[in-house]
């Protein structure tokens, strides 16, 4: 499917969207898609790499994979919440069981998306998430 023509982010939002996913192919395709829609995107290959970068505090929205070696997506979110970071989070995973969903809800995660996620569903989730923080 061809990528849509270049779009602008909703309401002129320019804060970065951070992708945290250990699968380089997934991260690269998500980044390409989001950049096509005019978003500023930063990718990280692990939760520890993301948490070590001070820019994580200023992210507009976080797309975090749940199942990564070392630190899971929900563990990353736990660390963020302990730091007082309240950036909106979209958790993406190929396996979202009931306990993961419950924990994600307790941590204030706004969207839970199953992999593979359709491009239109992801863009809709990001736009909704960003609109809710204005």
Where are the model-predicted features located?
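Non-catalytic signal-transmission and effector/linker regions of two-component phosphorelay proteins
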Residues: 1-18, 24-31, 120-134
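Conserved phosphotransfer cores of two-component systems
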Residues: 54-57, 79-86, 107
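The feature encodes the CheY-like receiver
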Residues: 27, 69, 97
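Alpha4 helix (beta4-alpha4-beta5 surface) of REC/receiver domains from two-component response regulators
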Residues: 75, 96-111
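Acidic, metal-coordinating helix/loop segments flanking the phosphotransfer/catalytic sites
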Residues: 43-61
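Acidic catalytic/metal-coordinating carboxylates
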Residues: 45-46, 72-75
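A Lys-centered signature of the CheY-like receiver
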Residues: 115
């Amino acid at each position: 499917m061809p990528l849509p023509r270049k779009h602008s982010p909703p309401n002129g939002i320019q804060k970065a969207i951070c992708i945290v996913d250990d699968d380089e192919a997934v991260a690269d395709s998500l980044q390409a898609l989001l950049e096509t829609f005019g978003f500023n995107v930063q990718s990280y290959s692990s939760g520890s790499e993301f948490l070590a970068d001070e820019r994580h505090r200023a992210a507009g929205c976080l797309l975090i994979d749940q199942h990564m070696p070392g630190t899971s997506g929900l563990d990353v979110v736990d660390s963020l919440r302990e730091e007082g970071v309240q950036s909106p989070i979209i958790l993406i995973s190929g396996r979202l069981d009931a306990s993961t969903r419950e924990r994600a809800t307790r941590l204030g995660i706004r969207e839970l998306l199953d992999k593979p996620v359709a491009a239109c569903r992801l863009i809709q989730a990001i736009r909704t998430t960003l609109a809710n923080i204005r």
